[in-house]
Structure formats: C-alpha cells, structure tokens
C-alpha cells in the first residue's frame, strides 16, 4: 500500500512551496527587527530628563531593546555619568 501511495501522491504545488517560504521569511524578519519605531523618541525623552539633573554628552546614553522568546522584551539603558567634581 505504501508503494501505491508513493506513486499516487501529489507533489506540493509551487504556490504552496512559495507560501511556506514567504511565511519563513516574514517570521525571520519579525524576529530580527533592529528596533521599534518608538525607541529613538524614548532615547530622546530619557536624555532630556537626565539633562535636567546632570550635564552629559548625548553620546553617553545608549538604549537597546532585546527580544527574548518572542514575548519577553528587555529594555537596557546605559548612562555614563561624568566624574563628580571635587567639593572644596
């Protein structure tokens, strides 16, 4: 019976193959998106708040968003503060 199924089985249509490949590509792109659209504005807002209290160079603030397991997001904020001035 397996031999009969082998000869009578239909090949996948090229449309189905193309659809599967496209689904794989879309899933990969969703996983590898570099950053969400709101991240630059978030960085700017955080920088403005920090500048209210400490004079820093904008390049000293980095904001990164990391995706883990599809449903977990980690926001990492690194701020390099200037060295404290010596009090006299």
From Swiss-Prot:
What the entry lists under Gene3D superfamilies is as follows: Cell division topological specificity factor MinE
ATP-binding: is it a keyword of this entry? Answer: no
Keyword annotations: Cell cycle, Cell division
Disulphide bridges, residue numbers: none
* Coiled-coil segments: none
Question: Quick check: keyword Kinase in the entry?
Answer: no
Mind listing the GO biological process terms from this record?
Answer: cell division; regulation of division septum assembly
Query: Which InterPro entries did the record assign?
Result: MinE, MinE_sf
Describe the family membership recorded for this protein in Swiss-Prot or TrEMBL.
Belongs to the MinE family.
NCBIfam families referenced in this protein's UniProt entry, alphabetically: minE, PRK00296.1
Give the protein's function: Prevents the cell division inhibition by proteins MinC and MinD at internal division sites while permitting inhibition at polar sites. This ensures cell division at the proper site by restricting the formation of a division septum at the midpoint of the long axis of the cell.
Name the chain's protein.
Answer: Cell division topological specificity factor
Organism lineage reads as:
Bacteria, Pseudomonadati, Pseudomonadota, Gammaproteobacteria, Enterobacterales
């Amino acid at each position: 019976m397996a031999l009969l199924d082998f000869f009578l089985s239909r090949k996948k249509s090229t449309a189905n193959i193309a659809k599967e490949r496209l689904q794989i590509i879309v899933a990969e792109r969703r996983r590898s998106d570099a950053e969400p659209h709101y991240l630059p504005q978030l960085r700017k807002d955080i920088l403005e708040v920090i500048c209210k209290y400490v004079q820093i160079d904008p390049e000293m603030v980095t904001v990164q968003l990391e995706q883990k397991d599809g449903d977990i997001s980690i926001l990492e904020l690194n701020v390099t503060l200037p060295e404290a001035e010596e009090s006299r």
